[in-house]
């Protein structure tokens, strides 16, 4: 036993004692390979996952580094079975490689013939393959580049993709750093993506992911398709690109419900891309309608499933995913890894906060109790309904009212998930509410009023995160 800040458990959870003198150092050390699940006041819970370990491997970390880190900071002996599992899992990444071939177009190459024998016997892999070239190499149908990466990941053998990319149609784009300067971590993020070819950059909210996208575009110097969550985000991207790059208004198009402009830089919304007409996704051909050199997926953790299917067919295009989290509600993190690419850059928000680039955040957990009536309902409710009882308890509303009153005059956002609860809070507090059915112009007006201080308190649903 040592006096480390970390408790490593055999179920792959890591418990970090945030009050320990080495907690910040430990947090920074485990961030490349462990995923934060919960961060209450005293103990933060992280988890080791296959994808997290493979992302770390893709970023250049090896199993020895991960194991040494766990042992160094662990308060108790690290379970041997977990150490073996970490080493075995990380060794799986890169044993298979996709490469371009002048004769066959695309080939799958291995450093371990046993692994290749295993995967070519898999029923879902066989239709994607061509002729066996030698004991270490087999041809892959070029049109199945995305599909085979998905299938190999599901088998537990994530392939490294070295097959290269098309340049796309050239278009001059440069950063215009006259009255601003790119931050060091933004530059590192763009360079990390570019050297990796395709992949995901993870940065906290407010850290300037749009600037990373602009820097990637300056690297590519090619036509670019940018996919965003909604029209507000599209217009924010447009404003930032006009301000930060040499692009002018005629070079940037908006492809949304309101407009259908295709320009050298086109910003499209997920909503319009996934809109069906007569049962067909009528707008997905935008991916193929232009010789894009770069495709940027903003808030990639929200990427709709239909776009994954089309992304599988455009693996020869450079793809950049931007997000504050790799966790998806639908559990499709593996699709992001295989089709967009592995994590190329990640920096903890605490580091950026310490450098003064984002406002300091003080997180405080306030625990509340259910009322007697709610306790009875909770006890008899179905398991899937119990979370809602806790989330919408009347006691929580009382606490919100007290907090808003205590911070009167400050800029306050009240964020929630359940619309009926938010409707009630909006009415009780006498403040505006932004939710899914709030018209676009009204959203923009309220956000603008909040930014200027005209409105000091807003109640918002999850749409505020889009």
Labelled PLM ranges:
Residues 256-294, 305-310:
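Conserved helix/coil segment N-terminal to the catalytic DExD/H
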Residues 293-294, 299-364:
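Post-DEXD/H (motif II) to motif III coupling segment of the RecA-like Helicase ATP-binding lobe
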Residues 251-254, 260, 413-415, 420-424, ...:
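Conserved helicase ATPase core of P-loop NTP-dependent helicases/translocases
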Residues 231-258:
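Conserved helix-turn-beta segment of the N-terminal RecA-like "Helicase ATP-binding" lobe
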Residues 378-417, 423-424:
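Conserved interdomain hinge at the start of the Helicase C-terminal
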Residues 167-202:
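Conserved pre-motif I regulatory segment
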Residues 195-217:
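Walker A/P-loop
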Residues 1-169:
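Extended alpha-helical interface modules used as scaffolds for assembling large macromolecular complexes
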